[in-house]
Curated annotation (Swiss-Prot):
Stated name of the protein: Single-stranded DNA-binding protein
Region of interest (Disordered), residue spans: 109-168
Gene Ontology cellular component annotations, sorted alphabetically: nucleoid
Keyword ATP-binding assigned: no
InterPro entries associated with the record: NA-bd_OB-fold, Primosome_PriB/ssb, ssDNA-bd
Annotated GO MF terms: enzyme activator activity; single-stranded DNA binding
HAMAP family named in the record: SSB
Annotated gene: ssb
Statement: the UniProt record of this protein carries the keyword DNA-binding: yes
Role this protein plays: Plays an important role in DNA replication, recombination and repair. Binds to ssDNA and to an array of partner proteins to recruit them to their sites of action during DNA metabolism.
Motif (Important for interaction with partner proteins): 163-168
GO biological process: DNA recombination; DNA repair; DNA replication
Protein source organism: Haemophilus influenzae (strain ATCC 51907 / DSM 11121 / KW20 / Rd)
Length: 168
């Protein structure tokens, strides 16, 4: 049976994306996303919080989108998988790092927030949203920008014959 390697992160960028271009011309974006969890300490009753930083890498079109739209403080939803890379440092020592290879990225929050400002996010539907998906082979992309939807005003049906007496 095959294993599952899937990561889902929702957090805020700690810095602007770092964008590089590989020798073959493909873009690479590195982002650092913070997630936090908080709890009340049983012994002291104090509110405690710990922040975890996640290094996420995007390639090709997704990397370009990151560089164009994401800024420090932007809230983002990421799906991806853990990857471990090996390289040699200046002394010839083998070094390893584990990072998330992003497959799906969706910007959350309002337009001002994704531009680096502090938008007024009241917890409703995002004002600005962009989702990009990358297949496992990295060659096919599907991106969509949902159109804003507003409900058309509906006329209420007439209340003729409505009895407003409560039966109890």
């Amino acid at each position: 049976m095959a294993g599952i390697n899937k990561v889902i992160i929702v957090g805020h960028l700690g810095n602007d994306p770092e964008i590089r271009t590989m020798p073959n011309g493909d873009a690479v974006a590195n982002i650092s996303v913070a997630t936090s969890e908080s709890w009340n300490d049983r012994n002291t009753g104090e509110r405690r919080e710990v922040t975890e930083w996640h290094r996420i890498v995007f390639y090709r079109r997704q990397a370009e989108i990151c560089g164009e739209y994401l800024r420090k403080g932007s809230q983002v939803y990421v799906e991806g998988r853990l990857k471990t890379r090996k390289w040699q440092d200046q002394n010839g020592q083998d070094r390893y790092t584990t990072e998330i290879q992003g497959d799906v990225m969706q910007m959350l929050g309002g337009r001002n927030q994704n531009a680096g400002g502090y938008g007024n996010d009241m917890g409703g539907a995002p004002q600005s949203s962009y989702q990009a998906r990358q297949t496992n082979n990295g060659n096919s992309y599907q991106s969509s920008r949902p159109a804003p939807q507003q409900a058309a005003p509906q006329a209420e049906p007439p209340m003729d014959g409505f009895d407003d007496d409560i039966p109890f």
